[in-house]
């Protein structure tokens, strides 16, 4: 049986997710009520039977470190682990200068473990994937590198590495985030084939390429720009079509679902994907569960049923986490993390509320993301007047209001 190792790159700053990333790394941003974004890639690896994982961290990693340490305890008796790897400056007093450099500075981990194949996956996407199927594809083609890819609309090409393949699935072209005239898919001028940022290397080839790149002073030391763009011209580089990946318990509708949640709008929409009656991505797949930390919080509670003055505690088309209290309020098409209290006569619509938030009486909140430890005074209105909201909060062009972690909101705002 082949020896496998997963290197999970979780060190990105996540600037486009500001202010949600002011105090945490992007993979540590809460998602779906009770998860962190990093849980999806780690769950995919665990469900695939790949149980040796190194999580490479760097920027604002305290929240991420705490979460991984509490949630991801595999058994050392069977040499299974999920271990954090901070920037160690093994090659000099410098931070990681790119995703490829993050691997170069930690090559000792790979050479010590001596895996036959090494997965290098990002930690900031939402999806389900059986990585063993990608491994079988890689082995069948005797590839040096296999890149997982997904079709995207041509208008989004500037955000991704765009791939060109031949009839056998071998990479024959690659441009990182093209600014014009992206290569479209054969027979479909409306879509491009985009790299998912998930790579599978034959380990010998990975070490050779990482060392070669580290010795190039002109390199950006980035997997897309530097490794893939160079390697496909010299080595056996193939492209794995993510749409072919079949996960147990997955509906046909969910197949191929993959979201880059690197911007506020994309993050918001991916969360909203979860709350539909028939969601395009379901958290309720017992055959391929998403694992996370388990806290000893009490069940969610819904109180008051006074129809006369509309003081009814209820939630519709929503995800309500443990420890929440909906006290005579209405929550609709929203996601609440643990220990959120929504008080009487308040309404919360199409919003994402992080842990330990208190929403006062008679508040009206719509299309908002509220970070942790925020107390919203009674009668506060958010999301109905964007000009007014912009004076106090961050508002995206699409009208999503973001309230930063721990923000103090004055009564009567």
UniProtKB/Swiss-Prot annotation:
Keywords: ATP-binding, Carbohydrate metabolism, Glycogen biosynthesis, Glycogen metabolism, Nucleotide-binding, Nucleotidyltransferase, Transferase. It catalyses: alpha-D-glucose 1-phosphate + ATP + H(+) = ADP-alpha-D-glucose + diphosphate. One of its GO terms (molecular function) is ATP binding. SUPFAM superfamilies: Nucleotide-diphospho-sugar transferases, Trimeric LpxA-like enzymes. The keyword ATP-binding applies. Pathway: Glycan biosynthesis; glycogen biosynthesis. Alpha-D-glucose 1-phosphate binds at residues 161, 176-177, 195. One of its GO terms (biological process) is glycogen biosynthetic process. It comes from the Bacteria. Its EC number is 2.7.7.27. InterPro entries: ADP-Glc_PPase, ADP_Glu_pyroP_CS, GlgC_bac, GlmU/GlgC-like_hexapep, NTP_transferase_dom, Nucleotide-diphossugar_trans, Trimer_LpxA-like_sf. Involved in the biosynthesis of ADP-glucose, a building block required for the elongation reactions to produce glycogen. Catalyzes the reaction between ATP and alpha-D-glucose 1-phosphate (G1P) to produce pyrophosphate and ADP-Glc. Belongs to the bacterial/plant glucose-1-phosphate adenylyltransferase family. Homotetramer. This is Glucose-1-phosphate adenylyltransferase. It comes from Anaeromyxobacter dehalogenans (strain 2CP-C). The lineage of its organism: Bacteria, Pseudomonadati, Myxococcota, Myxococcia, Myxococcales.
């Amino acid at each position: 049986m082949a020896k496998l190792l997963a290197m999970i790159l979780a060190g990105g700053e996540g600037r486009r997710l500001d202010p949600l990333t002011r105090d945490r790394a992007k993979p540590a941003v809460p998602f779906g009520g009770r998860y962190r974004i990093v849980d999806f890639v780690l769950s995919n690896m665990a469900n695939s039977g790949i149980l040796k994982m190194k999580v490479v961290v760097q920027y604002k990693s305290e929240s991420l470190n705490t979460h991984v340490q509490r949630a991801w305890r595999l058994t050392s008796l069977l040499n299974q682990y999920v271990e954090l790897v901070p920037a160690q400056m093994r090659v000099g007093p410098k931070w990681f200068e790119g995703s490829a450099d993050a691997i170069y500075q930690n090559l000792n981990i790979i050479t010590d473990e001596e895996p036959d194949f090494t997965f290098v996956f990002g930690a900031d996407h939402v999806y389900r994937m059986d990585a063993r199927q990608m491994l079988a594809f890689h082995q069948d083609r005797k590839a040096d590198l296999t890149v997982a890819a997904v079709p995207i609309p041509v208008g989004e090409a500037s955000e991704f590495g765009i791939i060109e393949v031949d009839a056998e699935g071998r990479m024959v072209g690659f441009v990182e985030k093209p600014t014009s005239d992206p290569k479209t898919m054969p027979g479909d001028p409306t879509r491009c084939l985009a790299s998912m940022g998930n790579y599978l290397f034959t380990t010998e080839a990975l070490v050779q390429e990482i060392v070669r790149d580290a010795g190039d002073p002109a390199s950006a030391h980035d997997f897309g720009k530097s490794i893939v763009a160079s390697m496909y011209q010299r080595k056996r580089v193939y492209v794995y079509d993510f749409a072919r990946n079949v996960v147990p318990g997955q509906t046909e509708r969910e197949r191929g679902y993959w979201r880059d949640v690197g911007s506020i709008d994309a993050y918001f929409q991916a969360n909203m994907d979860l709350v539909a009656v028939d969601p395009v991505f379901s958290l309720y797949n017992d055959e391929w569960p998403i694992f996370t930390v388990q806290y000893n919080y009490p069940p969610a509670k819904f109180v008051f049923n006074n129809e006369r003055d509309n003081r009814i505690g209820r939630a519709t088309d929503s995800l309500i986490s443990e420890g929440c209290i909906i006290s005579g309020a209405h929550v609709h098409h929203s996601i609440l993390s643990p220990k959120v209290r929504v008080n009487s006569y308040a309404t919360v619509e199409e919003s994402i509320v992080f842990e330990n938030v208190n929403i006062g009486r008679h508040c009206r909140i719509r299309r908002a993301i509220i970070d942790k430890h925020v107390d919203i005074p009674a009668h506060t209105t958010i999301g109905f007047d964007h000009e007014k909201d912009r004076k106090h909060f961050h508002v995206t062009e699409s009208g999503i209001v973001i309230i930063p972690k721990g923000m103090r909101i004055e009564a009567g705002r």
